[in-house]
Amino acid sequence: MSKKIQNPYKKRILSTTANSNQSFAKRQAISQTTVPSFSSNELSSTEQESLEQTLNKHFGFQTFRPGQLSIIQTLLKKRDAAVFWSTGSGKSLCYQIPALHTGKIALIVSPLISLMEDQVAKLNGVVSTGGGNEDKKDIAVFLGTGQKDQFAERKAVNGEYKLIYCTPEKLASGGGSFLNQMGNLHTRNTGVDGLCLIAVDESHCVSEWGHDFRPQYRQIGDLLRNHNVLKTVPIVALTATAVPRVQTDIISSLHMRNPNIVKQSFDRDNLIISVKRKPAGGYRSALKTFVDEVKKMKVPANAARRHSSTIIYCPTQSQVEEVAEWLSMALESTGVRVQSYHGGQGIEHRSDAHINFLTGKTSIIVATLAFGMGIDKVDTRLVVHGIE
């Protein structure tokens, strides 16, 4: 049986731009929202204007979305926060703005290399330091097995980036040596260096009740709260995937102290979800139907984007390879490019597939669950989960 989650063309997936504020506000109004202890009203007009100037300078937006100022203010006051918002609602800005506004550093723990690559590439494409092209410097970096710059970690611990992304494995690496380096960075007496917050992105991975439970995530709270220096740094947990008991488990596991909890509905009314019984001929019969539908579509000027973007998930790496190869051959005459992605492939192959999908050079990506968490691509129209 296969499950298809489709986003029809007439209903765009919410982007991370200010254009979706109206839809966001509508969803928030009908959701059950936890009213935070701090409200944006506690910000003086001067403070709010200053934060909005930072927002406009770095991202080009004029105003914050509902709830963002409350979370940012909480973190600037060195208080923990838990953000349970749907995908595309602007969670990332809640930890990006404090770092850019204060000139301090945000450490972000993220579960996947592909997710970190995506966020860092977009940040460095929009936000930078330096006056001209010759002295332009990246604002963000990720530390992990996919990092090609051998000096990236040295530059990070020297305070050359404002947003440092790492995996939970990196956080615990070297018997605590990386944490100690972050601690040294936090206590530097330079006036601007130091950590303003630690963000735990996709924090549902913390919970044993979560669908993506990851043991290394479970250690984050103990690692941070038992560290002599980092225990004072505010933590913000963010996820779009957490039922109430998972939310409670996240807060408990991370040892959050009186956090500002901000919720909204996770319902995405622009998605169509359908379940189809696998045909007698197996998944190849289902794929043939899919290929026939693609071939019937009108070809625009850019044939490679005729089907917009599709992700097909398979349960095993071998099936990923088989399905990707079959689709590539079946769609060869259409100009629709297909690539595969799974953890057994080399870093360069995965990076190439990831970038090509984000830039539209590849229309269909066949992958295991190693791909997809947090991927921000607004023209993704179809997600297929195949169950063999």
Where are these regions (language model features)?
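Helicase motor core with emphasis on the C-terminal RecA-like subdomain
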Residues: S45, Q53-H58, T63-P66, Q73-A82, ...
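Noncatalytic nucleic-acid binding interfaces
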Residues: I105
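Conserved Rossmann-like nucleotide-cofactor binding loop
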Residues: S114
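Helicase-associated low-complexity/disordered flanking segments
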Residues: M1-A81, A199
